[in-house]
A protein has these predicted regions:
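Acidic, glycine-enriched loop/beta-strand segments at the rims
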Residues: 269-283, 327-332, 340-374
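Divalent metal-coordination and catalytic microenvironments
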Residues: 22, 64, 162, 251, ...
């Protein structure tokens, strides 16, 4: 690394000449560890340390951060297994930081914070809050969650939620992760893709795989929440039958269904554990609220487990073209002008003279996301998912064509957007 402070980090990003425009939030974990060292994991900050953190965040804002982010979601761990710094920080620590973010029209972004913490922050110096949200998927849960969001915004609070557009959580299949622990499955796991495909076409080997999958506790995934993404060009995110139901209909053990669908798709078939946004009808009811924007998803994290890059294409295909939850202008506003306003970008988000020319040209009748696929192009040939789309003619970044007919050009016209 060639940076210490946040502004130097943004300088480094500029030197990389990004293809897209990027903006950043200064992270709580890094700031807390910088101030408190190893104590940052499980101890509370002193008043002096809280002030030091606020000073660092204030400098980051002056150097271009659009806000501050914190994560209170316990399953997010450091390499040694401890919850990341900031997970258990007192609310007063976040309030102290909000005192320097709010007056600069910065954004306080939270993951895993309860409603009272968010209200306290939103009531500090006029702070704007963005947080990750969703609904359980049970009947009526979308409307219930939307009403709760309305209640959080009472008394002048400015709290915006963001949520997935379709089921997400963990994707697996023959080309990526395998769902069973066992010696034969470990043998399959050790093979490359061609070797795996050959192995699952061997009857004796498959019988051994199924026998291990029948063992109690061989699979830790809740299979009643796992859905096959189908054989079509576009992934099927609205299928009603989970993997257990598919196997019962076929008179098979679920592992037999997994292996059969893998063979029939020539190993390319993927299975999606819908941890979040498993019910699209309820998600649509949640999206009815103006203070909720679509877009929560992993693209650059969990790169061999999740691929949410197609969420915006799905927004246009499912919620506009197929179900009519949104009109086309409404959906575009939700994905452009609204997020720009939440982030605090005043020079983009609408097609208007004098605004930045960040434009997508697409066919509303054709736009759709395509099936994710695994490639090995990371350092050391490490794997990651990629995902393409159909129906986009061009993506224009700062007036220059960045993507044409679905393929990147050599233009790298992106900028680091500073607050």
């Amino acid at each position: 690394w060639n940076w210490e402070h946040y502004g130097q980090y943004l300088d480094t990003l500029e030197e990389l000449k990004p293809s897209l425009n990027v903006a950043g939030l200064v992270g709580h974990s890094a700031v807390r560890y910088y101030v408190m060292g190893d104590r940052s994991f499980d101890q509370q900050a002193t008043e002096a340390e809280k002030q030091q953190m606020a000073d660092i965040v204030e400098k980051a804002m002056k150097d271009g951060a659009v806000g501050f982010s914190t994560n209170r979601y316990e399953p997010h761990k450091a390499p040694d297994g401890r919850a990341i710094p900031g997970t258990y920080a007192e609310c007063s620590e976040l309030v102290e930081i909000a005192k320097v973010v709010g007056p600069r029209d910065g954004l306080m972004q939270l993951v895993g914070a309860d409603a009272e913490v968010m209200k306290s922050i939103a009531e500090t110096e006029g702070s704007r809050v963005l947080f990750s949200y969703g609904c359980s998927g049970e009947e009526g849960s979308g409307t219930k969650a939307a009403t709760h969001l309305d209640e959080m915004n009472l008394e002048g609070r400015n709290i915006t939620a963001t949520s997935h557009t379709r089921g997400s959580g963990y994707m697996f299949g023959l080309q990526s992760g395998l769902p069973v622990e066992g010696l034969t499955w470990d043998e399959l796991r050790a093979k490359d893709f061609a070797g795996r495909l050959e192995a699952i076409n061997d009857e004796t080997f498959c019988n051994a795989l199924v026998a291990e999958a029948r063992e109690p506790k061989s699979c830790g995934i809740p299979l009643q929440k796992v859905y096959f993404l189908g054989f079509d060009e576009a992934p099927e995110h609205n299928s009603a039958q989970n993997l257990i139901e598919l196997s019962k209909c076929a008179g098979e053990h679920w592992s037999e269904t997994f292996l059969r669908l893998s063979r029939e798709s020539k190993g390319r078939g993927l299975f999606n554990w819908r941890m979040f946004a498993g019910n699209l009808k309820e998600q649509g009811d949640l999206f009815a609220r103006e203070n909720l924007i679509p877009g929560l998803g992993d693209v650059g994290a969990h790169v061999s487990q999740i691929m949410d890059g197609g969420w915006s294409s799905f927004m246009l295909s499912h919620y506009v073209r197929e179900t009519g939850v949104f009109t086309l202008p409404e959906a575009i506003k939700r994905m452009t002008a609204d997020p720009a306003a939440v982030i605090g970008l005043k020079d983009r988000g609408v097609l208007k003279t004098g605004m930045k020319a960040d434009i997508n040209v697409f066919s509303p009748d054709e736009v759709t996301e395509l099936q994710p696929e695994l490639v090995n192009d990371f350092p050391g040939d490490a794997p990651r998912y990629i995902q393409k789309s159909r129906g986009f003619k061009a993506t224009i970044v700062n007036g220059q064509v960045n993507v044409l007919d679905g393929e990147p050009t050599k233009v790298r016209a992106g900028q680091v957007l500073r607050h």
